[in-house]
A protein has these predicted regions:
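C-terminal motif of bacterial Sec signal peptides marking the signal peptidase cleavage site
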Residues: 16-20
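Post-signal peptide N-terminal segment of mature Sec-exported envelope proteins
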Residues: 30-55
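Gly/Pro-rich cap/lid or specificity-loop segments adjacent to the active site
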Residues: 50-333, 390-391, 396-520
Length: 520
């Protein structure tokens, strides 16, 4: 163990055991009604019979400090809306709200607002869970067409424990982390690619559980919900308005289950599927990535991009080279994540994003992989931290066996030519992680719920959307589902139409017509 790793490990141990201390964004806010669910009003209404709490401004606010430029620089972004302001802060949250485990974490938060945002406007809280640092997610949203959302209410991103600005988890040894980043593609073992992915996942699991035990499961979704409630208490407000994107929607649902009396608004944006095994979730994510890539191909052709008349064939050729190892040390998994990272973003102009990605991939095909390496590094920083590994493995239920991945491999490679093989392999890395209880889900909800889904979502896909909206419907509350016909993640990042609906919902819980569709 290096001196740096030892010091970081000691730091985590003290905190744990010490005393408690992209497809194009739309500028069109038009809404088309496609269908209505049975029993759901077909017009925007509020339900006076429901006792819906109001959003509140914090009574005791956090010690915010301006972090606008440092945040933009950290993620290579430029403001998408004039007057954009980022403020950063931290607060302490106990490792275990029940008191069974001692210690505390520092939880990082960031507030995004405009200079014109009313000072009395109550904040909405955003969590993207383990998908990516919530602060990074909010920064990307704010660098896009965010004026409609941020002009109405400030949005506060809360990083999940172990991720982003929150107390970092540093538990995987550098050599293991490098191998994990490539899913073992360049490991010296003579095993096949499936066994190599299992091996590196097991090594990372042993290293992290050895360091973090007996609190290795204190990074689950339910604990993230407790951190949300700790923010509520720090603010001195009765209830929160929560936007959960992707995996963060699971955190939002867990908060609704654990603290139903402290929830004022609930937006489920591109939620991860519930009640299914990890191979099903992996396939849903792959379907979303393929849909987002198809949208990129169409835009690329329309722009006469550098990938030529057949962008999909050109990228498939590049992926073949990566799989064969000719882009080493860049692995095929890193290339896949780099492409997905670019497709997810809503920052800046959609056409410019498409041209930039095309140029990066074209250069790599011509032998210059420098830009692709930079993109892969940004993707690894966004998706591949130790904290995310721990959180994702803790969240997961029903991880696949190596044989089930082998069985799916050929079918997925044919069905999903760009992303299929990688998705099946990625599902193996957490197979050795200790099983944690499933995240709690609400059986009743006393407030209306707004759910959003994108047609081309490269983060989670939309295959699990019906299950989530079905869960919400089963609670008996009013709800509305909106579909964005664009691509990217989350929906509020790319769709002004969806932002308009969220801003209106924040005021008095008014819902748009169920089944509404926002244009690409």
């Amino acid at each position: 163990m290096t001196q740096k790793r030892t010091l970081l490990a000691v730091g985590v141990a003290v905190l744990m055991f010490g005393s408690a201390c992209a497809g194009g964004p739309s500028s069109r806010p038009d809404v088309a009604v496609e269908q209505n669910s049975p029993g759901t009003p077909d017009e925007t209404t509020t339900d006076s019979a429901q006792d819906i709490p109001e959003l509140q401004t914090p009574v005791d606010d956090l010690a915010w400090a301006d972090c606008t430029q440092s945040t933009l620089d950290a993620y290579g972004l430029t403001p998408g809306t004039p007057g954009l302001v980022f403020d950063c802060a931290d607060f302490e949250s106990p490792v275990d709200a029940s008191g069974e485990m001692f210690g505390s974490f520092s939880v990082g938060v960031m507030r995004a607002r405009l200079g014109s945002t009313p000072s009395e406007a109550p904040p909405l809280v955003l969590t993207s869970g383990a998908d990516r640092s919530s602060i990074a997610t909010l920064a990307d949203i704010a660098a896009g067409p965010s004026g409609t959302l941020l002009g109405a209410n400030p949005v506060v991103a809360i990083d999940r424990r172990g991720i982003g600005r929150s107390t970092a988890v540093d538990c995987v040894k550098p050599d293991t982390r490098e191998t994990l980043r490539g899913l073992g593609q360049f490991a010296s073992s003579g095993n096949d690619v499936v066994d190599r992915a299992v091996d590196v996942g097991r090594d990372a699991t042993i290293e992290c559980t050895d360091l973090l035990q007996p609190q290795e499961l204190a990074f689950a979704t339910s604990y993230a919900a407790d951190d949300l409630n700790q923010l509520r208490m720090a603010w001195g407000v009765d209830a929160l308005g929560v936007i959960g994107t992707g995996n963060g929607a699971s955190t939002a649902l867990a908060y609704a289950a654990r603290y139903p009396e402290h929830l004022a608004r609930l937006v489920l944006d591109s939620p991860t599927g519930i009640g299914v095994d990890q191979m099903t979730l992996a396939e849903q994510k792959t379907q979303g990535r393929e849909a987002a890539f198809a949208a990129f191909v169409l835009r690329c052709r329309a722009l006469r991009c550098s990938l030529g008349d057949a962008p999909q064939d050109a990228v498939a050729d590049l992926m073949g080279r990566a799989t064969a190892g000719t882009l080493a040390p860049l692995s095929s998994h890193e290339v896949v994540d780099a492409i997905a990272y670019a497709l997810s973003s809503s920052a800046g102009d959609a056409s410019r994003r498409a041209l930039d990605l095309s140029d990066t991939l074209s250069s790599a095909r011509s032998g210059d992989v420098s830009e692709l390496r930079q993109l892969a590094s940004r993707a690894a920083a966004a998706y591949g931290t130790d904290g995310q590994f721990v959180a994702r493995c803790t969240d997961g239920q029903q991880w696949p066996s190596p044989q089930s991945v082998r069985d799916a491999g050929a079918t997925w490679a044919e069905r999903y030519p760009i992303f299929g093989t990688d998705a099946a392999m990625t599902a193996l890395t957490c197979a050795s992680w200790p099983t944690a209880p499933a995240a709690p889900l609400p059986s009743s909800l006393s407030i209306p719920v707004l759910s959003l889904s994108g047609s081309g979502d490269p983060m989670v896909g939309n295959g699990g959307f019906a299950a989530v909206t079905g869960l919400v419907a089963s609670t008996g509350t009013r709800s509305a589902a909106m579909t964005w016909q664009g691509s990217g993640h989350p929906v509020v990042g790319g769709s002004v139409c969806a932002q308009t609906a969220v801003a209106a919902y924040a005021v008095d819980a008014a819902l748009p017509p169920d089944g509404s569709a926002c244009p690409a």
